[in-house]
Amino acid sequence: MSDIQEQQASIAITLPDGTVKNVPSGSTGFDIALSIGKRLADDALAVTINGKPTDLHAPVLCDANIEIVTFDSQLGRDIFWHTASHIMAQAIEEIFPGSRFGAGPATEQGFYYDVASEHRFREEDLRAIEQKMLEIAKRNIMLQREEMKRVDAIAYFTSVRNDPYKVEILEDTLKHVDTVSLYHQGDFADLCTGPHLPSTSRLKAVLLSNISSSYWRGDSSRENMQRIYGIAFPSDKLLKEHIARQEEAKRRDHRKLGTELELFMLSPEIGSGLPVWLPKGAVIRSELETFLKEEQRKRGYLPVYTPHIGNIELYKRSGHYPYYSDSQFPPLTYHDEDGKQEQYLLKPMNCPHHHLIYSSKLRSYRDLPIRLTEFGTVYRHEQSGELNGLVRARGFTQDDSHIYCTPEQLVDEICNAIDLTQFVFGTLGFSEVQTRLSMHDPANQQKYGGTAEIWEQAEKDVREAADRMGIDYFIGVGEASFYGPKIDFIVRDALGRKWQLGTVQVDYVMPERFDLSYIGSDGQKHRPVVIHRAPFGSMERFIGVLIEHTAGNFPLWLAPVQAVVLPIAEEVHDYAKTIHTALLAAGIRVEIDTRNEKIGRKIREAEIGKIPCMIIVGQKERDSGEISLRRHRSGDMGSFTVPGLIDILKKEISERT
């Protein structure tokens, strides 16, 4: 073979660590993994070629950056769980012929599939489906990708698969696409872009967790479907570890702790998804609001208040009404005494109200930036199956701020908003925070407001601010709001789960729609840029996540009851009451337990109530004029004078440590 032929038959691949390997042209991801090591080949699920996720057995035909994908990565887990959803669908089809399938994606913690079936699934069905999935896995069925013309795919899903849901996707969502891809596994096939596992045999353990109700395409006017959730793993060991984490998650469930610690309640008489804050929970929320208000005051924010409802024309102008119409409560229709009709909406967003505040008077460039802020309650008609205590509610309060600035001030203001968000998360103990730059999808420009040029500038500004702040980020194409790109902050809690909480959004669109302006140094009108900013996001969601992150063990400054005085015997009650009074006067949230119970029981109940400080008072303490301090989960801390204790607690509270 000539040197030229050898060069043509060999390609250079670059691995993530920078290593360059020469391999034969046409080598697959599996071949490359095997050339690195058998262990990696055994663990390989897929491959990325120049950053694009691809099936493991797809050939690599030219020089490329290559990364072998395993279950250790989020991408690997997504691919594994997506394939598991296909295996579950095949199992359901084999057990319950005639079942049809809607959407079946991977999720953050597993997968689900929406199933249309005459059979009403029960708990025992889940166990049967699990066994069938493991049986399919043992068959070692290869997953085969097939590309076909969209018109041929319509014919296939109409006559062969008899699946009206996939036909609808092909005729609607994919109507502008010429070629689509299918994945076959034995007699089962599904419409899918992939990639997928090379074989069903990679699935070694599975747990189907629950069933909920859903609607086809999330539209309550469409067919009702049954959503089956599950998770799968490449080993039994990983499943056992997952089950252990789930048990811990149950212990930390904010709905459970919210009841036990008397933080909030949910009542069907009030309405689904409308949480009510009880006194202790209200303390937590109030302290968080005070914390942010104090910090915002230092940073030049101006507080405002707006109504809970607004004229529907306001939200049509902003675009929120058509954009959020599927998740809004129906309009309220009002007729005045002259018969004139007006329609109002429960407020879905605070921003249109703030824009009108800005435009209520002439603004100068010398006035900018203007930073308006509000803890504003908004309402979304979430599907009942999606409601989840505080973290997914129909009525919730946003720590919403809108910053109106000149284009020249924009990057500085984004940086300031990022800094505030990082400060909030750091204070509240969220040390692991991922940052996503949520960009628009250029292939779906009609989904967004504004021109392509406006979006290009907005995304450039967001990147510049993120780079200036030195934050690590990843890009989320298609994750932007309809009016602009976002910086989304995703925290990892104590159980390793990810929650999208705070956000910073850039908006060139709303200033156009609301004709916002300021007078520049040249005496002419100019258009401001708007930043939407919410470190907490939703107060309810944030507190729900915080409850689970801390397991209800709040820091002293945030605890609903910061201390409890525990007299050992009745003869020291008077001394205990003087301590209680002194702590109250110092601004400490303190209770006193004068029940005729043994001190051990009082301490145990205070520990269960997660009260940070237990102040033990007996004859010895009374005689010495001191107290004995016990800290929650830490035990005995020694003796202190009352003034000394107050100084220690006030310092810890003021520093919010």
Swiss-Prot record:
Alphabetical UniProt keywords: Aminoacyl-tRNA synthetase, ATP-binding, Cytoplasm, Ligase, Metal-binding, Nucleotide-binding, Protein biosynthesis, RNA-binding, tRNA-binding, Zinc
A Gene Ontology term for the protein's cellular component: cytoplasm
Domain TGS: 7-70
EC number in record: 6.1.1.3
Gene3D superfamilies listed in its UniProt record: 3.10.20.30, 3.30.54.20, Anticodon-binding domain, Bira Bifunctional Protein, Domain 2, Threonyl-trna Synthetase, Chain A, domain 2
A GO biological-process term: threonyl-tRNA aminoacylation
Name the record gives this protein: Threonine--tRNA ligase
Primary gene name: thrS
